[in-house]
From Swiss-Prot:
The keyword Cytoplasm applies. Interacts with TSNAX. It comes from the Eukaryota. Signal peptide: none annotated. GO terms for biological process: cell differentiation; spermatogenesis. This is Translin-associated factor X-interacting protein 1. The gene is Tsnaxip1. Specifically expressed in testes. Predominantly detected in the post-meiotic stages of germ cells. InterPro entries: TSNAXIP1_N (IPR032755).
Length: 704
């Protein structure tokens, strides 16, 4: 009966808790019922009673004295201690709480959705009992319980807020699965259609091959029959000639026989012959008289052939005279123009002379660059290397780079630029950034590796994002920002280095990366052409071969530009075309990434050709730089100055100028082309950023 009463007293609060819900009133009811349940607990114990400190009260009894491990006394004492410890039971209050927890857990219905919350309720009650019984620790235990309750409530709210997101994810997962299945079905259908088409084409190819074989056999048969007919006709022709010769011989023999048999041919009448002779002599006399008369009358007459020849000569001389008159008039005009030009040149000379005098009077003297030898690291030898072939402006840049490099070495940290929109993405950081202090060679090698990885990647991201991701992959997430600031400061400083200058221009959006990539492709193509000429793989070719390859590889370059490239490789006026050239050394780079003069000259010509092309485009547009130019007018102007441009290149130029995708450029819709417009200056700046160059000559060859 006591057990039954205890079971009822323990189960009653559980039912009331399930029905109460989560409202504040229900929580109050739950608290009151907990207090009632506490009163109904059998064999109540409180801190005022004697709570057993189990199992600590036996610790003093289990201490063993120092004994020999093999002695009988120690063995007996150990056995007695073990029996004593096994006979010790748990405190009554602990057993009651464990029995209550076990019964409550058995009575729970764990099949509902809130099974875990119900399972937690008995543990709450046990904890409440501890809080009420241990008065000394009640504030601490209450704060612990409240902290856990707050955290559980927060987690429940968070789970409740994430339930719609979970349902949405499930729905999206189902939609994506359906779309994937549909795409796979469509791909399977397309694959089956393509397979059928492939089989049909294979059958058609087999049929055509059979027809080809039959036709070839028929042609061979016809050739044999034609040869036989030709031989037969040759034989018939020869036989016919022989037969005709025999017939002619027979006819001649027959005529001779008929003449010999005809009487009177050889026996002509002498009277008739005398009369005929007399008449013939009279005709001869008359003809002689007429001939003499004609000679007398035609003594002073010029032959017609001579007359025609003289007339022809006269016409040629007349034409030469007219052409000489025209040349004389043209030369006279040119002489007048030259006189005017000479006068204007004299005026300009006087003006420039006066300006020179004024500049010499007011300007400072030319700087003595030898003073920099003692300041630059490396002494006079390094300064001579740096200053070789450079003008004053370039020497100022070199001096600034050397000074900046020293200041850059002294910096241990860079100030962070913040997170503003004007800050590049790879420099957005707040706080000091460590200066890694790499050498110029290390920076150049790092930029080369970045270019190699950029060219090799398939899915292209924006170049600044790629640059920062590359640094993360190379140096890790923690050091990527420090390297980004370090490399940025170095490439911003060393403008005389080609690879640093080009990388800085692409990184800051001043140039597209296609400019650098196409330049490398051009050099690779030129090297391949040179290797194709070097059949012996000796590494050297003649100057004549080098000049020919330059003209074929760069057909749009003028003769003066080809001459500049020849001079850049060491060809001079005294050199002969048979001199040998080590062409592989033209593409070498030093440890700081500096190219040979030949590659530098190629890049300078590329920049000048681009500027000339854009200037020609600007002149052809004939608009103010701040005026708007429509896509239709830009398209027509590009076709006028570059008639051989293909549609793909034209679409790419228009896409770059108007910042629209190349596939959306309306080349065929003139109405849309007339709507899209942009300022001339903006369009030219955007084309200057890209790999813009002439595709063909201004006036194409009529034969092509």
């Amino acid at each position: 009966m006591a057990n039954l009463q205890e079971r009822k007293s323990f189960s009653k609060p559980r039912i009331s808790i399930q029905a109460s819900g989560g409202t504040p009133e229900a929580k109050g009811i739950e608290k009151r019922k907990l207090s009632q349940k506490r009163r109904t607990l059998p064999l109540q114990l409180s801190l005022g009673g004697h709570l057993s400190p189990w199992p600590t009260y036996t610790s003093g009894q289990t201490v063993l004295h120092n004994r020999k491990p093999c002695s009988d006394d120690s063995r007996n004492r150990a056995n007695s201690c073990q029996q004593q410890s096994m006979s010790i039971s748990k405190p009554k209050y602990l057993e009651q709480l464990e029995n209550y927890l076990r019964k409550e857990l058995l009575l729970l219905d764990l099949s509902t959705d809130s099974a875990q919350e119900l399972r937690l309720q008995p543990y709450r009650e046990i904890f409440e009992f501890f809080i009420e019984d241990f008065k000394t620790y009640k504030p601490l235990l209450s704060s612990i319980k409240n902290a856990y309750e707050v955290m559980l409530a927060h987690q429940k709210e968070r789970i409740r807020s994430l339930e719609p997101l979970k349902a949405k994810i499930v729905t999206m997962n189902e939609d994506c699965s359906e779309r994937v299945l549909a795409m796979r079905a469509e791909e399977r259908y397309e694959i089956s259609v393509l397979k059928k088409e492939k089989m049909n084409l294979l059958k058609l190819i087999d049929k055509k091959n059979e027809e080809k074989i039959s036709l070839q056999s028929e042609v061979a048969k016809l050739r044999r029959s034609l040869a036989e007919e030709y031989l037969r006709y040759l034989t018939e022709r020869d036989a016919r000639k022989i037969l005709i010769g025999d017939l002619n011989e027979l006819r001649y023999q027959q005529e001779d026989m008929s003449l010999a048999q005809t009487p009177g041919v050889w026996g002509e009448d002498p009277v008739k012959l005398t009369l005929a002779l007399k008449m013939t002599r009279q005709d001869l006399t008359r003809t002689q008289m007429e001939l003499n008369t004609m000679k007398a009358n035609s003594g002073d007459v010029v032959p017609r052939r001579d007359l025609e020849m003289q007339e022809k000569t006269n016409m040629e001389l007349q034409e030469q005279l007219e052409s000489l008159k025209a040349d004389y008039e043209e030369v006279q005009k040119e002489h007048e123009l030259l006189l005017q030009l000479h006068m204007s040149t004299l005026k300009e000379r006087d003006q420039f002379y006066n300006e020179l005098q004024e500049i010499q009077r007011t300007s400072t003297p030319r700087p003595d660059w030898t003073k920099c030898e003692s300041i630059i690291a490396g002494g006079p030898e390094r300064w001579l290397v740096l200053a070789e072939g450079k003008n004053s402006d370039q020497l100022v840049d070199v001096l600034l780079e050397e000074i900046g490099m020293g200041l850059l070495r002294e910096k241990d940290f860079f100030p962070g630029l913040g997170f503003g929109d004007a800050i590049p993405p790879f420099l957005r950081f707040d706080g000091p950034v460590k200066n890694k202090k790499p050498s110029k060679k290390e920076v150049v090698n790092l930029l080369k590796d970045a270019w190699k990885e950029r060219i090799a990647e398939e899915q292209k991201e924006p170049f600044p994002d790629f640059f920062f991701n590359f640094l993360e992959r190379r140096f890790g997430v923690n050091d990527a920002m420090a390297w980004a600031y370090t490399i940025f400061e170095n490439i911003k400083l060393f403008r005389s280095s080609e690879i640093m200058n080009q990388f800085y221009a692409v990184l800051m959006g001043k140039n597209l990366e296609s400019v650098y990539i196409n330049q490398k492709k051009t050099l690779s193509h030129l090297l391949k052409e040179l290797l194709s000429v070097d059949t012996q793989n000796e590494g050297s070719i003649t100057m004549e071969q080098f000049s020919t390859i330059l003209k074929t590889t760069f057909p749009l370059k003028k003769e003066e530009q080809i001459q500049e490239l020849m001079e850049a490789v060491g060809w001079g006026p005294d050199s002969s075309n048979t001199d040998m050239l080590n062409y592989r050394s033209l593409f070498n780079e030093d440890e700081e990434g500096q190219s040979e003069p030949f590659v530098q000259r190629l890049w300078e010509q590329y920049e000048s050709d681009k500027e000339a092309y854009l200037e020609e485009l600007k002149q052809e547009l004939d608009l103010d730089p701040l005026e708007d130019v429509t896509l239709l007018k830009m398209r027509g102007t590009l076709m006028n100055i570059d008639p051989t441009m293909d549609k793909q290149t034209l679409s790419a130029y228009l896409s770059q100028a108007y910042q629209i995708p190349a596939i959306d450029v309306p080349l065929e819709d003139e109405e849309k082309q007339g709507i899209i417009s942009i300022k001339v200056e903006t369009a030219l700046d955007r084309l200057r950023m890209a790999d813009t160059k002439r595709v063909g000559p201004r006036e194409p060859d009529p034969a092509s």
